[in-house]
Amino acid sequence: MTFRHCVAVDLGASSGRVMLARYDSKHRTLTLREIHRFVNCLQKTDGFDTWDIDSLEKDIRLGLKKVCNEGILIDSIGIDTWGVDYVLLDKQGQRVGLPVSYRDNRTTGIMPQALVQIGKSEIYRRSGIQFLPFNTIYQLRALTKQQPELTAQVAHALLMPDYFSYRLTGEMNWEYTNATTTQLVNINTDDWDDTLLAWTGAKKSWFGRPSHPGNVIGDWICPQGNRIPVVAVASHDTASAVIASPLANKHSAYLSSGTWSLMGFESKMPYTTDEALAANITNEGGAEGRYRVLKNIMGLWLLQRVLKERRITDLPALIAQTEALPACRFLINPNDDRFINPDDMRAEIQAVCRETDQPVPVSDAELARCIFDSLALLYADILHELANLRGEKFTQLHIVGGGCQNSLLNQLCADACGIRVIAGPVEASTLGNIGIQLMTLDELNNVDDFRQVVSANYDLTTYIPNPDSEIARHVAQFQPKRQTKELCA
């Protein structure tokens, strides 16, 4: 067969999309077409911040039906989403409780309990995962302690992409790359860790053994009656994004830039040393047995909240205004935990600047300048941490995802990091999703083969660092800004 048609369902923390890929195996050309795009946002339900997963499922099915109604024969479907969140089911497959978001405050104070009762080094030795207060391990502990009446009803716990695959196929799966984000998978066995799981109060019977990407979960029956395989892709969206990052060599780092920024490098071995623990490095699972050694950064969430609060719809115009402002007048630590989900992001940023005796950003452009400069400096700081960890400097940084369209931030990043930045592809999570599907269909050999296809089919933009830029002069001064209570601590 010359052509393959694969559908990627890519759900982010702020939006979702159903994308159709067409792959010409003879000429190795790959094109994407957006079929359906929809909003994903938090809603308050019974006092909890929750996801509207019924609406998301409706939009997923609508997008798939649109493809089928065009008369296109779909070869496979894959689903990727954000990490750590889950859905509980009873024996009949019906939901138990609410699909609570990681941004909900129910996990406040839970992580410190684990550090005392199990020990920080012991948790890290077992999982190799970064300490984030909303990791699934702490969410499950919050659930079993705060809502114990629900636990007796639970038969299964599915992470978000596995839940939507289940809704399409009726078959359950626990995909490995996303499972590792829970901080509950043992880094040595690739299976659920008995000690960590027992601490949460959840039962091991709720989970099946994690499976590596590339297996067929089951079939979705389209309106025309065709059975279409649903593939377990690298279902954590960052894992998919990294697959589509055209990394040139082992000296290339990546930055998946969106609501979250995830900066790291690929490795065939995990880093679980005392130094890695002190730097709060995470070793998330990747495709083909690779590890994604990285750090989570709050990312463009701060900007997204400001845009929403200020009702700003013309982002390019705002960026143009921002570029005209002087650099580094207002600096914050974007990973300060006070930015996780404040009532008013603008007011929170202003408060930090006021408390640290800086000028206070007032205009929308000043707020954006504060966010962009601070992110670029944080990127530089973390890249330096990662280089020290592996004992070798990086020569270039690949920025992928929606954030790579921000040329101002890309240049600031190059200047602050002092290395060449390669921006693109934009739809990295979608492409990585498609890549695993094509490998499962035996159209491609491996991840490296797929990256060659990405490089040949998608435009990449290079940014050269300017050592004389204003932001480059502030890199050494930024470290004190990070001495706050970080999200990733």
Swiss-Prot record:
Provide the GO biological process annotations.
glycerol metabolic process; rhamnose catabolic process
As its record notes, the protein acts as a catalyst of:
L-rhamnulose + ATP = L-rhamnulose 1-phosphate + ADP + H(+)
Kindly list the cysteine pairs connected by disulfide bridges.
68-222, 353-370, 413-417
Pathway(s) it belongs to: Carbohydrate degradation; L-rhamnose degradation; glycerone phosphate from L-rhamnose: step 2/3
Entry keywords, A to Z: ATP-binding, Disulfide bond, Kinase, Magnesium, Nucleotide-binding, Rhamnose metabolism, Transferase
Matches recorded under Gene3D superfamilies: 3.30.420.40
GO terms for MF = ATP binding; glycerol kinase activity; rhamnulokinase activity
**Annotated active site:** 237 (proton acceptor)
Pfam families given in the database record: FGGY_C, FGGY_N
| Family matches, as NCBIfam families | PRK10640.1, rhamnulo_kin
Q: Which family does it belong to?
A: Belongs to the rhamnulokinase family.
Q: What is this protein called?
A: Rhamnulokinase
Q: Which gene encodes it?
A: rhaB
